């Protein structure tokens, strides 16, 4: 269906495809892999600095969802009723951190951005929401390695 849509068959509406796939997944007792194209949980998620920066620029500066969807993704998220997701990880830039905070209604401070950014650089994974929220309230200098160890041990 997605390929037909991308080839120009515009009478195909893809907004219900995810829900349909979830239903089939539950009936067949076969989970959809997180990295599955178009319908997997991570299909429109990125934490990579350059890719995320381009999407952020399209969404913030140009206010252009079309550009973010059609140029930076093989399948447009909006056609599936979804949106691009920017996460924070070891290869993220500071723009990922700022965008992530702003998307959640948090006005980022330089200190918050720096703490989260430095923590992410030492992590070996994409940060979870719990990890980022735990870092948001930190006010003083810190040892990112010690915090990383502490947060991952309690998770």
Please report, for each region that a protein language model flagged, where it lies by residue.
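Glycine-rich and small/hydrophobic secondary-structure elements
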Residues: 1-11
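A mid-to-C-terminal "edge-of-domain" accessory segment
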Residues: 9-155
